[in-house]
Amino acid sequence: PVTRVRYERERPGELIHVDVKKVPRIPEGGGHRALGRGCGSRRGAGTSCLHVAVDDNSRVAYAEQLPDERKGTTCAFMERALAFYEGLGVTVERVMTDNGPAYRSGEFNALLEARGIGHKYTRPFSPWQNGKVERMNRTLAREWQYARAWEGEDARAEALASFIERYNWDRPHSACGGLPPMSRIVGVNNVLAHN
């Protein structure tokens, strides 16, 4: 049996957990949650990829639903995630990922190296090592992805940004003593004001 060690980094940006999760697409007009399973013989709509980044200390999250998990897409997501954290006044020091091909690519590692950011990999088949982003994936599934019967993929994708904003600014988080994740950044080094 593996002993899992719980930890929390001392300051925002010290470690950002990053992961990709495949998400089934919803056909226009709604899927089986909206129409019921016996709605006809519709073909599957395929999948998209939910790219997620979570700060270890504050639990502030950034996520985008993108068409794939190729290295170009993953690098572009990482650029935007880093810009998001930098916009909050957070200096990212290190990123933790699994061993997926996009994260192992030279382009992804060059992007981090050019910014002076370290890259730590989890051990193969050890998702608990990246547990904070894995837990965020579960929260996204419960509170956004399957929270209601969506009428189509566009409606669900549009709701992601507002869910992430609500998660960061308003939703109580047990790791933050019942306060929202942004409470660990605001007043410390945040350069933005929430409306």
Annotate each predicted stretch with a short phrase.
Residues P1-E28, P101, N109-A110, R123-P127, ...:
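Basic, flexible linker segments flanking DNA-binding modules
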Residues P1-R6, G13-E14, R115-I117, R138-N195:
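C-terminal domain-tail junction helix/linker
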Residues P1-V54, V60, A76, N195:
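Mobile-element integrase/transposase regions
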Residues V20, D56, D68, N99:
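Residues immediately flanking
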Residues G40-C49, E64-G89:
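Active-site beta-loop-alpha junctions of metal-dependent nucleic acid enzymes
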Residues V60-E64, K120-T122, Y146:
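Short small-residue beta-strand/loop micro-motif enriched in glycine and branched aliphatics
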Residues E69, L88-S105, F125, G177-M182:
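Acidic/histidine-rich, metal-coordinating catalytic segments
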Residues R94-N99, E113-K132, R148-E151:
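RNase H-like polynucleotidyl transferase catalytic core
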